């Protein structure tokens, strides 16, 4: 459960950052795929 929660928080932060950088483009639905270690 903690992994899902952490992933959700990371996705949320990614979406917020994306909106600030690229406000005219919708963020990817699976940002975790681009943030894999």
UniProtKB/Swiss-Prot annotation:
Residue runs in coiled coils: none
GO annotations of cellular component type: mitochondrial inner membrane
Record-level GO BP terms: ATP biosynthetic process; proton transmembrane transport
Alphabetically ordered keywords of this record: ATP synthesis, Hydrogen ion transport, Ion transport, Membrane, Mitochondrion, Mitochondrion inner membrane, Transport
Chain ranges passing through the membrane: none
Source organism superkingdom: Eukaryota
Keyword Ion transport applies: yes
Localization per record: Mitochondrion; Mitochondrion inner membrane
Chief place where the protein resides: mitochondrion
This protein's record includes keyword Glycoprotein: no
UniProt record similarity statement: Belongs to the ATPase delta chain family.
Assembly description: F-type ATPases have 2 components, CF(1) - the catalytic core - and CF(0) - the membrane proton channel. CF(1) has five subunits: alpha(3), beta(3), gamma(1), delta(1), epsilon(1). CF(0) has three main subunits: a, b and c.
Function: Mitochondrial membrane ATP synthase (F(1)F(0) ATP synthase or Complex V) produces ATP from ADP in the presence of a proton gradient across the membrane which is generated by electron transport complexes of the respiratory chain. F-type ATPases consist of two structural domains, F(1) - containing the extramembraneous catalytic core and F(0) - containing the membrane proton channel, linked together by a central stalk and a peripheral stalk. During catalysis, ATP synthesis in the catalytic domain of F(1) is coupled via a rotary mechanism of the central stalk subunits to proton translocation.
Protein name: ATP synthase subunit O, mitochondrial
Protein source organism: Solanum tuberosum (Potato)
């Amino acid at each position: 459960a903690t992994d899902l929660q952490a992933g959700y928080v990371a996705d949320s932060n990614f979406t917020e950052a994306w909106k600030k950088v690229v406000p005219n483009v919708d963020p990817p639905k699976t940002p975790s795929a681009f943030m894999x270690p």
